[in-house]
Amino acid sequence: MSGVRFDSGPLPGGTLFAAPRMVIRADTASGVSPALAAIEAARAQGHWLAGYLSYELGHALMPKLAPLMPAGRDCPLILMGIFDGPRPAPALPDPAGVRIGPARPLWTRARYDAAVTAARDYIAAGDCYQVNLTFPMGADVAGDPLALTVNYCAPVAER
């Protein structure tokens, strides 16, 4: 982690947290408690914290969900930087010339069908009343990926 950018707050016009004095990271359930303790200690000392807590962190925090922790995760459960303070974020790059290729699913049709079947089975069994089934997509980007975000943040006219 080299830094974290927020397009709004706490500073007007965007906020950048750069050059963390330390990075707190938990990749496994056993690393979660020490990471949370380190985060709280840094907060108590008056440091700024910026980073993320992954969705899968819930599996480590709730014993009932622990067996459902996805295997082969490729991102930490916790990744948090300790910073001295925020600074104004630099202007975003011009999005002209950035192109994104066609989106393609990163799951096979068989994997998708199996996930839909499992979701329907959970609902039918009364284990849940809805499922937000998502799956990863990929696309090739030509140009600066940060400039690509400018396109997605731009207001869109209502139809």
Describe each model-derived feature in a short phrase.
Residues 1-159:
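Extended alpha-helical targeting/anchoring segments
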